Amino acid sequence: MDLAIVLPAVTSILALAFALALFDQWRERRGGFQLIWAIGMVFYGIGAGCEALAAAGGWTEGLYRTWYLTGAVWTAGWLGLGTAYLLGKTRFGYSFALSLFLAGLFTFLVRNRPEYAGAGAMPLLYFIAAGLLALAVAVETYFANDRWPILAASAVVGATILSLVLMATATLPAPGYAVDPATGAPVATLFPPQLRLLTPFLNITGAFALILGAVFSTYVFMPKRRVLAYSLDPNQPGDEFLFNLFIAPFAIAVNLVASLPGTARALVAGRLHSRVPATILIAVGAFVATLGDTLSRFGMTEWFQLGKFLGVLFLFAGFLVSIEVFRVIRVPFTSIRLGRVRQEPAGAERLAAAADVADAPDGTDRSGGPGVPTEHHAG
């Protein structure tokens, strides 16, 4: 059994099956986040499928181009965008704005690396675009407008369209593909730097959004012990708001750690909202997949396939655990149920209601948007 073929093939099958299930859930419930996640998982599956086909029959220029766009450029960005739509009615917009800004900043800072020689002014343009969009998302979030995911979508969709244009105009030297001679894993060395810079732009934005979104949701839905207080009430004086915005990540981290014992007790008692374990699994999946991709960029390509396989396993498990995403688990596009309709435990709903109380304008812990029940993040 050749793992170079089996591992990406199984990864592709799991990702595409996952995408099919998400499309089915979207067809019934019309959750925008389900549709966007489904698109992201289709890209994940196609990218892994290209690797399996190449391992079995050799690389071609068509496979190489398809692999790079779907697997290396698009997947993480679209999965992160799905998280933005899931949390579109909350203050998570600040986190997405930070993800966008860091992606643009990284793209600009690496412009002088040898592999990006010839990129010209594109790194600066990417940075400016990311900065402006990040500012716009933050402003929309500040005024509690749930339109900020549309701005997030403009970044991801815009980068996707640009990557298509750059790919269509790129001429690759023979043989039309490049692989690591030691492991046979594909590498992006043949693509123009303007296109290659879109990879960290979308990957950092998407991976950070997935991981931060998982931490955000875990914090909102876990029984909280508030050790450090903060407020993101937009009605407070500007200097106080900026101070609270600055300390919010530290306060959330401290409060999250302090809340872990109570969360463990709620889990044992069957009172924990499904969003908590689900989002932890999703965060682990995003981290593992991103880690494998990052290591491959530094020449350690032997972890590339394993990282993608483990990533899709954790992501799939996280989404299946989430009652919000899969209230009914069934064979896609049929009425054949694989179990009964699932409901959150009564204790979990009380914990979610407690999160609403903490979210009041005069509260000290604004995890969500004003007047928006946090258990209805999906819209």
Regions found by a protein language model. Give the residues of each.
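Individual alpha-helical transmembrane segments in multi-pass integral membrane proteins
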Residues: 1-15, 31-134, 306-313
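Long, low-complexity, intrinsically disordered segments
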Residues: 354-379
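Membrane-interfacial loop-to-transmembrane alpha-helix junctions, especially the N-terminal start
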Residues: 28-41, 91-100, 147-155, 272-282, ...
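Aromatic-anchored segments of alpha-helical transmembrane domains
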Residues: 44-49, 102-112, 159-167, 284-292
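C-terminal transmembrane-bundle signature of multipass membrane proteins
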Residues: 212-221, 255-359
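Membrane-helix boundary/juxtamembrane motif in polytopic membrane proteins
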Residues: 142-159, 215-284
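Extracellular-loop-to-transmembrane junctions of the mid-late helices
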Residues: 3-11, 114-219
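First transmembrane helix
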Residues: 1-28, 137, 204-223, 246-262
